[in-house]
Amino acid sequence: MGILESISNQKAATRRVLRARRDNLDAVLCASHSAAVLTHLFQLPELNAAEVIFCFISTGTEVSTHGVIDRLRALGRIVLVPKILPGEPMRAVPFTGWDNLTQGVLGIPAPLESVAYPSYVDLVITPGLGFSPTGTRIGFGRGYYDRWFATLEHGLRVGIAYECQLEKYLPTETSDVPMHIVITEQR
């Protein structure tokens, strides 16, 4: 077995463990932990100074970002969300409201609009199955975020997750882009 195949197998096994941990949290705990993450997130000076913020739209047992998106919009910020089209890189598309979403690729809610935002992003709120305290991220295995990060000239990358999704070590490849900051309900 080659090194890359070994890393790929390690990542697949790690994803299974981390997904199971997250999915074993009950709805009440997910809601309270998500509220705590939101509180920590809005204590970031970089978020409060940001004008253009990219934020994933949470699904299932992920840390809920619905309150984050609503609060940012209420503050007058430009909120961008992911849009994935078959065979194309992920795009950052303006969020125009919960009523303007459709079921996108991979079952993830996405804007009806497909035109990418033409400018910079100040801060990126990033999903993941797991993170290390130093910012290493393991996503869902399709590479959309890592490839998109490679196109960004700047922008603070902030990973959000539950504390149970943190691991001291995560298997990585050279294409994996780390976070600048990782926020959980405890930190």
PLM region descriptions:
Residues G2-S119:
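N-terminal active-site beta-alpha-beta segment that forms phosphate/nucleotide-binding
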Residues E88-R187:
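Conserved phosphate- and dinucleotide-binding cores of soluble alpha/beta proteins
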